[in-house]
C-alpha cells in the first residue's frame, strides 16, 4: 500500500509573501492548527481556552503553527536580572531588568529566564530572555504527552480525563501560584491598631516565624491558621459581659485592653512567603503656641521646632507562593477546544501501554471528537507520534489544503511511514489500520480487542483548579433580609437550591428532604434554633415557616394588598379552608355562588377585622389547614 508524500516544496513558504499567507492574527496563529478540517465555528473556542492556561515547566511543542518572521520580530526586551551588552571597543551599555516571581492577574507566577550567556554577540531582533510560557521565543505552555482515545471503565465518560500518576510524581503539570493578602491598620475610638509581635494569649511557638515588627519573615513556611501579620486592636473592658469576666477569673487571666486581630493564613494554604510590601503615610502635626494678651491678641503662632511626624494607617501586602500538583478535579485542555476534568489518577502499572512498553499518560473519550468536529486533534497526536520517533519539529499552516487535496492527511501519513521505515517499528503504521495501534492492558498485559488511536499531543493545564472550587459549609453567615445563607465561596456561603433543583427533588418524591432544605436548612429561624435541642432530647423536629415567605407577605402588604395569616380558634375560621376533624357546613364551590355563602364570608371578614393582633399566627398552622 502506497501513501502520497508531500514534498518539501509544498511547505516552502519563502516563495510567497507573508502578507498573502497570514490569514489569522499572530496571537491566533500560535494556537490553532489544522483549521481547515475543523468546524467553522470551532477555531474561536481554543483562543478563549488558552487564555486560562497555567504556566508550567514546559518543553517546546513537537509541532507548532507557522508564524511568519515578518510579524514575529522581537524589537525590545524590557524586563529583572541585568544584561550589559558591549565590548571594550564600544563603551555604551544597555541594561534590561528581568522579572522574578512576579504575580499575574490570575495569581500565577511570571518569571523571565535569560536566553543568552555572557560573551554572546547579539544584534537587533535577537532574543534576550524567555518568559514562563515560552522557550526560544516560541509559545510553550504545556507538555507533549502520550494520549490514547479509548473508553476505560467509564472513568472518561462525558469529557472526563484519566491520567497517569507519572504526571504527578514527576511534577510535569506542577505550577506555581502567587497570592496576595492585605492587612491595614485603622483608627478606632480607643486609638490606632498596631502591628506587633506581642499578641495576647499567643504562645511563642505560634509566632516563631515572625520578625521583630510582627510580620512573617521572607522565606518562612506557613500553613493554614498561621499568623502572617500580628495585629492588636484596642479593646474596652467595660463592654465585657459578666459571664466573660467570670471566665477570666476562673482561668486566672488578666483582663487585656487589646484583642487579637491578626491576619492568618486562609484555609488550605501551604506556601512560602516570598515578598512583603509595606505602605505607610506620615503627616506633620502642627503644634502652636498661644498667649492670652487680652482683647486684640494675635492668632496662635506655629513653631517649626515642635512639629511632630504622625504615622497614618499603614497597608501591608504579603505574597505567598504555593506549588500545586495535578489532582482529581483539575481542568486540562488541548489546542483544539478539547477540554475536560481529571476524574482519576491511575498507577503507572495499570495504564495501557504501547508495544515498546511506553505507558499512556492520558486516556480521552473518543466520543468527544465526532460530535464537535475538531478532527485536528487526531492529526496533531499522529504527527506528534511521528515527530517523537524522528526527532523532528514541524511548522504547520492552518490552511494547508490550498496545496492539494487531503494535504494534511497525506503529510501525517507520510511522516508515520518515514518513522516506521527509519526505526523499524512496524506498529507505527499498520496498512490495515492506518493511524491506530494495538494497545495492551496494564492490569493483565492482554491485548485489547480493537486498535486504538494513540499519539503525542500538546496538553495544557488550565487555571480552573479544584482547590479554588471546592467548598463546604455547616453553619455560617446569613442574609439580614431573607435569613438565608449567603452565596459564594469567599463569603462562606451555602449551596444554592434553585427552582429546577426543587423540581428534580419533587420528581423523585423526596418530600422530607425537600421540606428540610426549604425550612431548617435555609431560613426557618425558629427551627434552626430548636433543631439541636430536639435532637438531644429525642423529640420530633418541628418545621416552622420560611422567613422568605414572611418577607413576601410584607412586600405584598406594602403594595396595599390586605394579606395576612390568621389563627385558628373557636371564634374565627379561615375562609376557603375546611377545618380538620369537622364537617363543612358551607358549600364552597369553584364559583363561590349562593347568598348563604356570601353572608358567611362577610361575617368571617368582619370578625377578622375586629380581632387584628390576636389573630396573627405562624405559617405552620396555615400549612396544617392547607
From Swiss-Prot:
- SUPFAM superfamilies from the entry? beta and beta-prime subunits of DNA dependent RNA-polymerase
UniProt xrefs under InterPro entries: DNA-dir_RNA_pol_su2, DNA-dir_RNAP_su2_dom, DNA-dir_RNAP_su2_hyb_sf, RNA_pol_bsu_CS, RNA_pol_Rpb2_7, RNA_pol_RPB2_OB-fold
Name where it's found: Plastid, Chloroplast
Q: What is its EC number?
A: 2.7.7.6
Return the CDD domains for the record: RNA_pol_B_RPB2
Q: What superkingdom does the record give?
A: Eukaryota
Where does it mainly reside?
A: plastid
Region: Disordered; residue ranges are 287-307
Subunit text: In plastids the minimal PEP RNA polymerase catalytic core is composed of four subunits: alpha, beta, beta', and beta''. When a (nuclear-encoded) sigma factor is associated with the core the holoenzyme is formed, which can initiate transcription.
What GO molecular function annotations does the UniProt record carry, in alphabetical order? DNA binding; DNA-directed RNA polymerase activity; ribonucleoside binding
Q: What is this protein called?
A: DNA-directed RNA polymerase subunit beta C-terminal section
Where is the secretion signal located? none
Q: Which UniProt keywords apply?
A: Chloroplast, DNA-directed RNA polymerase, Nucleotidyltransferase, Plastid, Transcription, Transferase
What is stated as this protein's family in its record? Belongs to the RNA polymerase beta chain family.
- Species per Swiss-Prot/TrEMBL record: Chlamydomonas reinhardtii (Chlamydomonas smithii)
Q: What Gene Ontology terms for biological process does this UniProt record contain?
A: DNA-templated transcription
Entry's Gene Ontology cellular component terms = chloroplast; DNA-directed RNA polymerase complex; mitochondrion
State the function annotated in the UniProt record. Answer: DNA-dependent RNA polymerase catalyzes the transcription of DNA into RNA using the four ribonucleoside triphosphates as substrates.
Q: What else is known?
A: In C.reinhardtii the gene for this protein is split in two.
Q: Which reaction does it catalyse?
A: RNA(n) + a ribonucleoside 5'-triphosphate = RNA(n+1) + diphosphate
